[in-house]
Swiss-Prot record:
Name of this protein: Small ribosomal subunit protein uS15
SMART domains in the record: Ribosomal_S15
Gene symbol of the encoding locus: rpsO
Function noted in UniProt: One of the primary rRNA binding proteins, it binds directly to 16S rRNA where it helps nucleate assembly of the platform of the 30S subunit by binding and bridging several RNA helices of the 16S rRNA. Forms an intersubunit bridge (bridge B4) with the 23S rRNA of the 50S subunit in the ribosome.
Complex formation: Part of the 30S ribosomal subunit. Forms a bridge to the 50S subunit in the 70S ribosome, contacting the 23S rRNA.
Highest taxon of source: Bacteria
Parts of the chain that traverse the membrane: none
GO CC entries: cytosolic small ribosomal subunit
Family: Belongs to the universal ribosomal protein uS15 family.
Length: 89
């Protein structure tokens, strides 16, 4: 259900360039997207889990803030990330 350490490490290397570059906006968005996908499948199976629903909404809001920041700072990196993660339809 949750995103494992190995998955986070792989996403960090893929979007950050190295394993220690965890603060990069693209890495944070990629990890949040993986966690959101995991929570979404959990919510399909457990419709009455209100705590997980709240956690899902918090992660979606955090990802939205980070994407808004990235769009404001560097539109090309934003577009590349959106395309890579298949976000925004």
């Amino acid at each position: 259900m949750a995103v494992s350490k190995q998955q986070k490490h792989d996403l960090t290397v893929k979007f950050g360039g190295s394993a220690s570059n965890t603060g990069k906006t693209e890495v944070q968005v990629a990890i949040l997207s993986a966690e959101i996908d995991s929570l979404t499948t959990h919510m399909i199976e457990n419709k009455k889990d209100k705590a997980s629903k709240r956690g899902l909404y918090k992660k979606v809001a955090q990802r939205k803030k980070l994407l808004s920041y990235l769009q404001r700072v560097d539109i090309e990196r934003y577009r590349a990330l959106i395309k890579e993660l298949n976000l925004r339809g």
